[in-house]
């Protein structure tokens, strides 16, 4: 269980230092600006506070960019109950209440301020250069990632690059992306050429995120930065970018980084696609009809390290209702099966709030393009084939479909020691004991499997896209049991990304950077859904998907609290009544 506890221990170390509250950004900044950090241990403790921001956002996942990216894409609808208007608003590119995502906005800036604290303090310490470089590289990666999410979510976000609490205002909408790319370039240069084995960021994770950020920025802003440019249907990606320090980052530089990641990261594709997902864990696999008897084995069984993971969020058994809710995987909870029905009805998928029903258009498109692709059944549960499944949730389920995303789901297992014969999560059986904080059999706090944000298959597909060759695509297809393709095409690459990475949070920014979002979203109109358990149709709201995308370019509403402070202007498309979601019916 060492892997599961490492970040908690480090975060607790931060909390104990000088009685500093890790949630108080100003105190962290003041402490470090004079004499802290001094030792390697001090620096690692501050860095743990930067990492802890990953889990802080997991406490309220429904307000995060990752959650929005799932529901806003053409692969998922909103879901949730009639009172969960935020979920439906995310899908419809609408808003619900004044500060729908303000918790996320403020949390990410806290993480950025912690990173800034460490970045500013490190040059003045007496640590050896290798230690400084490692800490600096990780801090720059995390700052870049936090800005990546903010800039993807809101567009023109203020840039804070030094610790402090004074008000900062917006610059140019492209400025955040240039800083993101520069931070990631620096992280690649600073981090040692060695694979991390303890869950920390390494050089290769930085190369992978550099590829992702480059592909988004160069594609999305390829036509310019006005609303018309960003919503244009012309795909004309940039080939070079001038960075804030006056240097230039080219497409060839990014290819070099991705090639290095592929060749030297020590990552590899897992032999069987199903083994990536928690439903093949040893406590569940032989009781699930889809997986039993096939030799599947989850790569994270008993806290093992996933050889395909480059960047993930870790969780542990110390989640509680106070400040540590985010130590549990609350994305799993939110994407769990709605309705509180018996675990046997939905086995092996556990309970939750019903976010992100899979859009029928994804299943239809996939079956038409690749009828023999085993990844489809590995990724999506068809409830129409499960006689025990009961539709409607708590008689309130909105935008329910026949399809359920398996990848991020809570997973149960059989347990003869319990009255109903099932543990609410397999983790209760795999990791017995020491559930002293959350308590055992707590369906809201016992999901602790990793949330993988970047995996090696994504890097292979980025390599193919950047180099316009089929090598990476065909390696991914080979694992899926599919025939190789003979020649590279944008259509083949885009399809392969959609199938391989379905329901993993990457599709939304792919649609935006390829300038195909409006057309793709429109396919969700008219698909079959259920409303409170009764057959219904997914109908346009607030003008429809195309109108809302073209009005906003996919950026969310700036929280009104931030607008009132005078630090940001409201984004286009969010000032009229047509942006406010009033409910499904």
Which residue stretches match the model-derived regions?
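An aromatic- and glycine-enriched ligand-binding surface/loop that stacks and positions planar moieties
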Residues: 21-85, 200, 204, 212-401
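Short coil/turn linking the two alpha-helices of tandem helical-hairpin repeats
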Residues: 149-153, 158, 195, 213-225, ...
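Long, intrinsically disordered, low-complexity segments
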Residues: 18-22, 108-109, 236-249, 277-337, ...
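Conserved, well-structured interaction surfaces
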Residues: 32, 39-58, 80-154, 164-200, ...
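Bacterial Sec-dependent N-terminal signal peptides
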Residues: 3-4, 16-41, 144, 180, ...
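Flexible, polar/acidic helix-loop-strand segments at domain edges
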Residues: 92-93, 308, 357-454, 584
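Bacterial N-terminal signal peptides
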Residues: 9-16
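Residues that flank catalytic or metal-binding motifs in active/ligand-binding sites
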Residues: 155, 202, 207-209, 305-307, ...
